[in-house]
Amino acid sequence: MPELRRDPVVGRWVIISTERSRRPSDFASAPVLPRNSGPCTFCPGQESRTPGEVLAVRIPGSAPNGPGWDLRVVPNKFPALRIEGELEPAGEGVYDRMNGIGAHEVIIETPDHGASLASLPETQVVAVLEAWRQRMLDLQKDARFEYVSVFKNHGEAAGASLEHPHSQLIATPIVPMMVEQELEGALRHFRMRKRCIWCDIIRQEMQGRARGLGRLILGEGGFVALCPYAPRFPFETWILPEGHRSSYEDALGTDRRALARVLGEVLRRMNQVLGAPAWNLSLHSAPLKTPTLDHFHWHLEIIPKLTQVAGFEWGTGFFINPTPPEEAARYLRAGVPTAT
């Protein structure tokens, strides 16, 4: 029997279509493999092909914007928003507009063209996580910006135009609608119960694990990875700090090391179970001007590209998920592919 489930944060309903239930081996897609060995725009020796770096982790003595780096952050050569100028908001009847002001940056995660977050050493993943944090803290100083979205597209099917390992961030003068919905839903829960909804979710999932019923994948070093109760997509996974933290920027050094371990392990298990799929990652953190909130809890969302969003989803807002999260979590806990 199919089941309708309601997301406890934003109130979105999804259809868990058990009659279409699919195992990992049913999601036939080409694994994400290097298409070429480089050199590409992001490879060492090609630094002149990118805008000047705004942050870099370098070998001592190496010159900026040249070889000798472990990580670089550069403005996007083809930005979605421009950093120069003022917002100048205006209206025309019911229509609102403002200038397309923002920041769009690329985090080049490693010199190794053929690597991935799943294969990088923990220390390098920590460097990536710290680069996200440093850039968020710097962009927070710009009074025009309300939010910084950090995201990663892994694989062509996930929207990656270049295969060299990289993530991106976009600072916007508006808090994104999806984050606004999370903020509003979390505030409703907090006003009723005086508790953070994500803290309650973590608590309930950890209790479920003790009974062998949960959607928890793993927990380590103060972080948990879980498949949410009402996932939009098969094998959708969240990573959250166990303790209440509303802003990613507040993450301590020990937090980033633990997060690097959990993130790397989740991605490796997805590769094992799902055959190295394409995926999207997004960071949800508190808005820049309200970094400390009792009702919001920062988290990562990882969505493997296993199904297509089609007419019903676009027309209704309902998502049809053929894999119950309990099954997805069970496969990811085992971390081994299921035979056909």
Please name every model-derived segment.
Residues M1-H164, I170-S246, T254, L267-Q272, ...:
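Active-site microenvironments that recognize anionic phosphate/pyrophosphate groups
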Residues E249, G253-V262:
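Gly/Ser/Thr-rich active-site loops/lids in small-molecule metabolic enzymes
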